[in-house]
């Protein structure tokens, strides 16, 4: 069973008062090994007494489904040098770094602790603290500029806190990647106090003592102080902090829109395709790879360079890098918002946000894959939840009018004696005839 079902308490806390830390570490190590050995076979891997918290087990499953390697921390898309300096100096999290340093970093020397600040996607902007711990962390690439999102590294406190939009602790072998099993961490997301949008995360990384409730309370208190500092900043700035991050809106049949600095800028379908594909591949895309994703006939390198040159004029030359092509600024998309809601298990919000197909007019292979992946994920969440109202809304949407699977699920929620039941059954019969069933 999940650990919080067996032991009462806060499921976001890793080590509770009275826990035998050594025994817990052995049990979690064994559970992690069993989970990895099961290789995704349903019903195999963990026993009822595995002592794995559900928040951790669900993160392990997401990590495995994303294809994260449990033995390698790879980061080919490191942001370094001038690119990193420009990115983080312009990032809203830079405004609260002095507060974080005062509360956490100044007393971290010779403690074995690291204090990390990430952006909303899990990229580490600053890693400070004990010098020997920083040296040791090099082996797992826990360094400034590295991507520590859950999608890239697997279960870890900053990445999982961002994925779930909640403060969380990860203890030793609860990390998906074995390279990180000697470490524990506590992290919490930081929000724009005006819009509520996630700006980044604050993390404390170190030994087992980092996974106790007091450290999570310290992180939450630091986040509260940081967000108060952001509110003070906003008194002198009418533009929300998150408004500085450009945003791509792709849903529906209308023209895609780039939202930048409060302005809504209609952009071409090709530019929207490129931006969405680059956001789907934060590690970057070579010219050849981008060409294949954009067109089945494969565009030549000259055409790709010309498109990127035009896109820089619209998006901003300082926000795009080359070799490989990649976005080097904070960037959000409506696709990412729906995915975030699904990752939190919030099907209602996902359904509300998912207002139309992704770039409905695009025939680019890469976009078609994103479009279908998102549609099937939303559909699966609705089927899993079985909420009659959400299923009904889906059947009246552009996504679900001809979705016989959801129509059948909706039918199962209705009273067979109700008039609506016969209407839904008639719709299913019509769809079956159209499909030749």
Swiss-Prot record:
GO terms for molecular function: DNA binding. InterPro entries: GAF-like_dom_sf. It comes from the Bacteria. Keywords: DNA-binding, Transcription, Transcription regulation. This is Uncharacterized 47.3 kDa protein in thcA 5'region. It comes from Rhodococcus erythropolis.
